[in-house]
Design a protein with these regions (language model features):
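N-terminal acidic leader/helix
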Residues: 1-38
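Helix N-cap motif at beta-to-alpha junctions
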Residues: 10-14, 42-50
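Short amphipathic alpha-helices in soluble, non-transmembrane regions
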Residues: 20-23, 50-58
Length: 58
């Protein structure tokens, strides 16, 4: 079962996350508000673990 996860990043980090999500074939939506990018990702447990590890490094 997939859950929605929300993340807010600056534009530089958002570009990096976007490339990572595309490489992992993870479904997401992104919207911009001034200098922040808001991501909504639909993840299962294993994908959520991967993204959390990536965000810790970022």
């Amino acid at each position: 079962m997939r859950k929605a996860y929300n993340v807010t990043l600056n534009r530089h980090d958002a570009k990096i996350l976007k490339k990572y999500l595309h490489a992992c074939k993870i479904v997401f939506e992104a919207s911009a508000y001034f200098d922040d990018i808001y991501f909504t990702m639909y993840l299962d447990k294993s994908e959520a673990d991967l993204v959390n590890e990536f965000l810790e490094v970022l």
